[in-house]
């Protein structure tokens, strides 16, 4: 459960935050015609001019400057990049923020992870007419995912003329912070100008016949990379005291004996020295991902056709981006190294073999970590393409009953390639070598090439294996991993509404809307065996699944003569997984003269588990554990408490704790229930020469979908001994650690 209470203050000039709509229209957050001022949720409105003043080429960068929005995925993400751009309303996450375009749900973002998080890169920047940011639950109007709120991009359907624009931008940074200069690592350049971006936008619109409007557009954008090495704040990964964090997976390697109290070595010249060295793993990472994006689209509008309006739209968006990480390597790879490996010097043989009573015919069990600086940095290449078709018709049935019927279909594909990783199995094969330094051969035979990591490396490839790492060995152990995925969504929606007049003096009129909706998602994802990739922190796996929902909803609007306006809405959802939900929305808007408005609302909203939450297979995933209370020579927990987590008497007091990155298992669950959130909002608006909005809100989130923190599981097992937690814990049976082995 999550509870939060937050206070926001919005203060801007010239009415940019509060929409001044002079006519009744369909507004964000309602299916009944009224002004946005009468929507009980807090709502802020911006136009294209507001966005362009920021000078940004990314709509997510503009939105992230708003106080009610946090960034989710963006071009500034590399390590956990999805290749998409998204934002989070009220800090609840991108999967709990619903994105609309022209009042309709935007296509799902990426089939790579099968989540509902939508990609803002699909929005045609040049045609944005208005952006509405509505906070608070809106599942009654839009369905699942609208827990934090909705962001609606309204496009200019009646653009007239030709518009051609070009924009160039870049970053300039002075790396002169003295706090970083005192630290012991290489500094970034004194002054840099980078991240050059270019955008070309072309729009064409005209009235081809009377009341028939055609609008089309083409947008292109390219952005250059910025690496961490170009900034003083990121030239290495900084810890809390501004010192450089580092990885023990270094070019000198880390060789740990697989036994209780096993020694640790690294390569020094052609010998093993005690301990390990450290490597700056951050400098090659992307601080800003490079990308290329192009969009095309056509919007066709037919008006006044027997009291009907038809809209037919087609959108296509193509996006390429690369997320770069530092060199791969082998990370705590379990290897039974032959003691007769010809690359071992006499001193190295003595250290790991003869000192442990092993002979040339034996193997030394080791955990080996070693950075592959002879190769290239890891790169995650994303190629996304989205095709979206929308058909929409508005009209009058009879007796002032109005209706809206819409259908939309989208197809999003992803081609993903993970470059320059190392195959675990081939690395093991290449380390199991016999023969002589001049004529080494792999024990496994086949096309295996010996990998000599027992000499200091300068990063250059060698002509023969006896001198170090060769191109043949690098080619053999290197691997590229691929994913091809497709996510489709079809949605049908029908809404009918009518305004009733009454003879009641208090309630002179009543507006009512009824709606039906059907939505279906299908995911197909084919992935290589990512579990063999040594550098995979969040490995992909094949995934197939579908999700369907049938929904019925209603909204009632009561304008009272006392300038009090009441809103009620409700939605019933029936999901294909034998789950159903009922959501509601109650709102009150009180007007005081022309300057003051008071709003109150309470909503129950949901987020249904998405395809990834439901169907994802169980797989090894990277997790973080700051400390193990059962490690070290003097553990902070007793032996009886540690025994609950798998610590034996022989391991107690002999478990090392040198790593914070550990392995965990994570997967989907078909028994998941929908998340439910109760949101209460109170807003005060003042509008005169300036516009001022003050919002108070509280959110209670139950049945949150996600994985538990490993520290939470470990602490609860230690404290309670409950099998629910303790059965989730597995230590290395030999060393007792969480990070050695798989």
Regions found by a protein language model. Name each.
Residues 61, 65-67, 71, 75-79, ...:
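Surface-exposed beta-strand-turn/loop segments characteristic
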Residues 85, 149, 160, 198-202, ...:
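Hydrophobic, lipid-facing positions within transmembrane beta-strands of outer-membrane proteins
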Residues 162-164, 210, 214-216, 308-312, ...:
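Transmembrane beta-strands of outer-membrane beta-barrel proteins
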Residues 137, 168-172, 220-224, 316-320, ...:
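Transmembrane beta-strands of outer-membrane beta-barrel pores
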Residues 158-161, 208-211, 305-309, 396-403, ...:
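Short loop/turn motifs that connect adjacent beta-strands in outer-membrane beta-barrel proteins
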Residues 24-54, 110:
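N-terminal periplasmic "start-of-domain" segments of outer-membrane beta-barrel proteins
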Residues 91, 155, 206-207, 300-304, ...:
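Residue-level signature of outer-membrane beta-barrel architecture
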Residues 608-693, 742:
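Outer-membrane beta-barrel signature, preferentially recognizing the C-terminal barrel domain
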